[in-house]
Amino acid sequence: MNTFGQLFRLSSFGESHGRGIGGVLDGCPPGLTVDLELIRKELSRRRPGQSALSTNRNEADEVELISGIFEGKTTGAPIAFLVRNTDMRSQDYDYLKGIFRPSHADYTYHSKYGIRDHRGGGRSSARETIARVVAGAFAKMLLNTMNISIEAFTSQIGPIALEQQDSTLFSSELAAENPLHCPDREKAEAMMALIARVKEEQDSIGGVVSCVVRGLPVGWGEPVFGKLHARLASAILSIPACKGFEYGSGFDVSQKGSQQNDAFYFDGERINTRSNHSGGIQGGISNGQPVYFRAAFKPIASIRIPQETVDKEGAAVKIQIQGRHDPCALPRVLPVVEAMAALVLADACLMAKSKERIV
């Protein structure tokens, strides 16, 4: 499927070496002031060629807003947009036309469709995430009107991880000091050095993104099959190279129930919890506490080290991947994680509004 969401719905299109990447966003409420600077900022964070930590493919990534906006505000009509591709080197991929790259989508796409665009991965390329980031910026505009914030940061690269695992305690100011958006100066330096070394070795490395959502009201999310954490997991795991997701205390099963349970108390204004092991979600519905989750991204599959594989006839071949590739999904994936979280929450917002009690 190329469409995500129920009421706040994105349909995306485009390939890595096609004419462009774009989308149609349907369900965005009318009257929302369009923040063009926010869209540019989010695209810039995702844009290739911005630092030594990323690919040197150089794209301007300027968005054309085609419909759904009048006099600086959304009209309620579908918002169509396009970001044109300008720096493609398709010839770098000609030798791969009949070869399946290890751990890429080449084999599965070919097996499923009988045809595939071999240029830069085609539709399976992470360049597709441009559409998510643009749509996510509109979702953020909606959430900003309710003082809801979303912030992702780097919490691990390879074996180097933050010691503080409580995502809600990190410093935005410290994170803003480095390209990785890591809230620990020492760890950030070590992480960047590791990525640089891996890049020099023509290899790649994986990492973990932590994300915090603040300001959510109580009551967003649906019971049973539409649980908020399940929809977040679906959204985040749809991002290329994402291999794992946990929210709240997640896989930390060493504690007993008496330690994990979040005790309720009344703070004089509203019901609160003394801890937040639940990650801001209980029964699939937001409880008013910060929502936090972590997502693991595998090492980028495109590496220049020689590898063994087969062609579409099954003959064994040895390849050395050319082209321009990131040594690590982080930090460029951070705005994509935020965008997907924003799309889920904007959709949850509209669903909650549609079910507000009238008696």
Name these PLM-found stretches.
Residues K112-V224:
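Glycine-rich, mobile lid/loop segments that gate access to catalytic sites or pores
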Residues F13-R19, Q202-I205, V209-A316:
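Glycine-rich anion/phosphate-binding loop at the beta-strand->alpha-helix junction
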Residues L43-P102, D106:
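Glycine-rich, N-terminal phosphate-binding loop and its surrounding beta-alpha-beta segment
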Residues M1-R57:
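N-terminal, positively charged regions that mediate nucleic acid binding
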